[in-house]
Regions:
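His/Asp/Glu-rich mid-to-C-terminal helical/loop segments that flank catalytic regions of hydrolases
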Residues: 286, 401-438
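Soluble metallo-hydrolase cores and metallopeptidase-like ectodomains found primarily
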Residues: 107-133, 188-261, 272-279, 283-286
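Second-shell loop/turn segments in exported
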Residues: 31-37, 52-61, 147-156, 160-161, ...
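N-terminal capping segment at the start of a domain
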Residues: 29-61, 77, 84-86, 183-192, ...
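Catalytic-core environment of secreted peptidases
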Residues: 40-62, 71-80, 140-148, 152-153, ...
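Metal-dependent peptidase/peptidase-like ectodomains
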Residues: 243, 291-396
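N-terminal export signals
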Residues: 5-23
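Noncatalytic luminal/extracellular "stalk/propeptide" segments of secretory-pathway proteins
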Residues: 36-40, 45-140, 144-150
Length: 438
């Protein structure tokens, strides 16, 4: 029994009703005749608009603006629109700071949030050593996890260390986050997870200063305050067509910061594919979905799968536009990161057997993704994992990281028109070839 069958057996309920899908041919494309919706310039303009909405945490003003932007775009094309609620903890803070003498370090409070008194928690900053956990009892633990050059930030190891510090009796944690950029690197968090002590992230670029504070035994104050509570984002679903099997195009829209290279290419390509799709003479119905709640470990996607996704037997194809597959590469140098005009190599494309030869042809020459990984639920990452868990017979999905992944500096400049355009055209070529063979 697969995941979908388990959910059906448990009686998953829809979050919101949906009217009938618009018949094919209704509505007028937003793009004027002759416009190339797959041009790199057009894709880049959408990435810039998305980043311009600001921070994309679930239910934030930037996240809600993105949902409305998607809904308006798809509605103007003639799609039937449904929006469903995605409730998640409010991850914003009013203060996230460490002070030591006259030094002040503002950082990122790592969810799940645990707040300090408004006056902060005072104490000694003590290095976390797994071999002697009692060292941090009653103290503020200082956590650093090294990484190999070129590797992504070891988020899972940091998460384990935070939990271990809490179990050892630490009153709080300050983490110097190892990563390519030297900035804080937020970690995706299960929506039901709890942590009993406050955790402040600071960038690795501050590590030498933090080491000095620990070495001299200075008194420090850790302060994390905020509104707390929960807030609601939206999954936005667009349907088009009256009959035939479904083609599903999914992309996450939310994240900890502005998510330019992480989310931007998927956002832009989803919008472009929606214009292209309704111009095709194919015997299918189209469903596009932009999910909130992603940074809460795929929470919004999970709700969509439970309540709104068509059944696998009703679906001809599912293509997931995940993280960082259209981001740009960076070289790590002693002076810092140097942006390149080539695609980020830390990316993956996984596909079911029917799509592999089509992808190999369409993506030829595109490093890494020209050789798709065979579909394997035990190796799938990101929201494409849910697609495979539920047994959808035909599909493909991207995921990846990048040098600015989950950092406050992941802006629109973390991708380029020249990187995105060939990916966009290859995706459309594969989808078109698959559906014309139905």
């Amino acid at each position: 029994m697969n995941r979908r069958e388990l959910m059906v057996g448990a009686g998953a309920l829809a979050l919101a009703g949906c009217g009938p899908a618009s018949p094919a041919g209704e509505g007028l494309p937003v793009a004027a005749a002759g416009d190339d919706v797959f041009s790199g310039a057009r894709l880049m303009a959408d990435v810039e608009t998305y980043v311009g909405f600001g921070t994309h945490r679930t239910g934030s003003p930037g996240d809600l603006a993105t949902s409305d932007w998607f809904a308006n775009h798809w509605r103007e094309l003639g799609y039937e629109i449904e929006q469903t609620e995605v409730e998640a903890p409010n991850a914003d803070t009013t203060v996230a700071r460490l002070t030591a003498g006259g030094a002040v370090f503002d950082g990122f409070a790592q969810p799940p949030l645990s707040f300090t008194p408004e006056s902060g928690l005072a104490g000694k900053l003590v290095r976390w050593n797994p071999a002697s956990p009692a060292d941090v009892s009653g103290r503020i633990a200082y956590v650093y996890v090294a990484r190999e050059p070129g590797a992504v930030s070891p988020g899972a190891a940091y998460r384990q260390a935070f939990q271990a510090c809490a179990e050892a009796g630490a009153i709080g944690v300050v983490a110097a986050m190892s990563g390519p950029s030297g900035e804080v690197v937020a970690i995706n968090t299960p929506v039901t997870m709890t942590l009993t002590i406050p955790v402040l992230q600071l960038g690795e670029k501050l590590k030498s200063q933090l080491d000095g504070i620990v070495d001299v035994g200075s008194d420090v104050t850790l302060t994390i305050t905020g509104p707390g509570g929960a807030r609601k984002g939206k999954n936005t679903i667009a349907r088009y067509g009256a009959e035939g099997p479904w083609v599903i195009i999914s992309t996450p829209q939310s994240g900890w910061f502005t998510c330019g290279g992480e989310r931007g290419p998927g956002i832009a390509m989803s919008r472009a594919l929606a214009v292209w799709a309704i111009k095709q003479d194919l015997p299918v119905r189209w469903l596009f979905v932009a999910t909130s709640g992603h940074e809460w470990t795929d929470h919004g996607a999970d709700l969509f799968h439970q309540n709104n996704a068509p059944e696998p037997a009703e679906t001809a194809l599912w293509w997931h536009l995940g993280a960082s597959y259209g981001a740009r590469a960076h070289d790590e140098t002693p002076e810092g990161l140097v942006a390149k005009d080539t695609p980020n190599p830390v990316r993956a494309l996984m596909a079911t057997p029917d799509l592999v030869p089509l992808i190999e042809k369409a993506f030829s020459g595109q490093a890494v993704i020209e050789t798709p990984m065979p579909a394997d639920v035990s190796k799938a990452l990101g929201e494409y994992r849910l697609v495979l868990e539920e047994g959808y017979p035909s599909g493909a999905g991207f995921w990846g990281g990048n040098a600015h992944f989950h950092t406050p500096i992941d802006g629109a400049e973390n991708t380029t028109p020249a990187i995105m355009e060939p990916i966009m055209r290859a995706i459309a070529d594969v989808i078109g070839a698959k559906l014309k063979a139905l």
